[in-house]
């Protein structure tokens, strides 16, 4: 008989360990949340802490991109790197808003998709009816309410999640 295998031993995986990417993103959100006047990054920290197990294994899609175990984490990790690069170029950007929006932009996929231990994704009823933009925006609004966070920056964060597909043809809720 062969060795005992787990889902971690099989299938496609991102080139970096999911735990490493998760900790990198959460550490960055915590750093932002520790700054005076921080608001939306506190929402990001709470969402990441609450959904750690799913974030570590969820696929980013059923078939479009990063459709494998840990694919969502890898996608977000790479987008965070791109956002950090934008902050180096455009000093007018708000680091807390941009990085929190990137960290949370696809968080609704945790309810839009059901991902098995191998990383195979299928759409949930909620996902088919609402989509991850609406689901993610709602998750953020509920977490912010629970934390007592409100204000314009929260509205901007919610807008980023609702608008991140850019145009209606790609499924954006607002532009």
Please give the residue ranges for each predicted region.
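Divalent metal-dependent catalytic cores for phosphoryl transfer on phosphate-bearing substrates
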Residues: 64, 85-175
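A ubiquitous short alpha-helical element
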Residues: 10-15, 66-68, 124-128
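Metal-centered catalytic cores of metalloenzymes
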Residues: 2-4, 69, 73, 163-166
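Extended, charge-rich, solvent-exposed interface segments
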Residues: 2-59
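A Trp-anchored, charged/polar loop motif used as the substrate-binding/catalytic surface
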Residues: 82
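Active-site flanking loop/helix segments enriched in acidic
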Residues: 54-75, 118-123
